[in-house]
Amino acid sequence: MKRILSLILAAALSFGVLALVGCGKKEEALKLGLGVHSTATVTNATEDVAGAGQATMTVAAVLVDENGKIVKCFIDCADSKVTYTADGKAVANASFATKYEQGDAYNMVQYGGAGKEWYAQADAFCALVAGKTLSEVKALVASDNKGTDEVINAGCTILVSEFVLAIEKAVESAVESDATAKDTLKVGVSTAQTTKDANEDADGYNQLETTFFAAAINGEGKIAAAKTECVQVKFTFDANGASTFDATKSILGKYEQGLDYNMVQYGGAGNEWYVQADAFCSAALGKTAGDVSALLGSDNYGTDIVKAAGCTILVDGFVKAASKAK
């Protein structure tokens, strides 16, 4: 009898040890935030030089812990320039690529005299802000909008003020998610352009619609958490190529506008844009970039999975941006 009890006790102890080893420490769930800071500049067309509208959209994605400290950060910048002629014709761009996407082809070292390319400096800044709170990140901006000595010594010598403004929006909008510190944080960016020539009765336009998709990718290559935003900038001009766009106004993303975007009131939608964007992100959870591409649907309005999740708007921008977040 004693031998039987001893065997039972030994088995119980062994099971307990194995259970403890197998469980391990559970990774802390982190908040995911996405922020976009946008500015615009314009010029008038002349007989010799096309007029231009340039939108600089700096995006930051962050993973934030329960103490408000940034665990991971990713930064990119969509610096998109469109043009129009002195006779009021809009010019279509062949393609758009962000500064990070361009990599070495951005040529900041060769033409700007920088020590490192833009993407390397952005990565250096992101590495530096890991472990810092928002207030500590704000303190990294020097009086000339470049970074403090701490930033420069980390390998980032370019202007960082817009990095910080984007990070501020990202941290302040961060929401609970299933992302952990083990996940890879990425942002995909896709830009669509629509144009219309001007005439004597109506202005023309050259419009940019840039979609940002932030994703925390787990070890299986699947999306553990996601957030999306879209910034629409409509550069207008008259029949003589003179800009009629007000570059002094603030540029806010559709998500950032919230109820003020008024898609329900003016577009007849069932839910506001930010609600539908969240619904798409929910449908993307647990999927790979390839799986997300399959959510497009034949009419660009999403598959039944997307619609059932509560997203009934065009999703091609979401899908194209998400496919790059890998």
What are these regions (language model features)?
Residues F15-L30:
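Sec-dependent signal peptide cleavage junction
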Residues I8-A10, V17, V319:
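N-terminal cationic amphipathic segment used for targeting or macromolecule association
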Residues M1-A11:
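Positively charged n-region of N-terminal signal peptides that target proteins for export
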Residues K26-K326:
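Active-site- and interface-proximal helix/loop "cap" or "latch" segments in soluble metabolic
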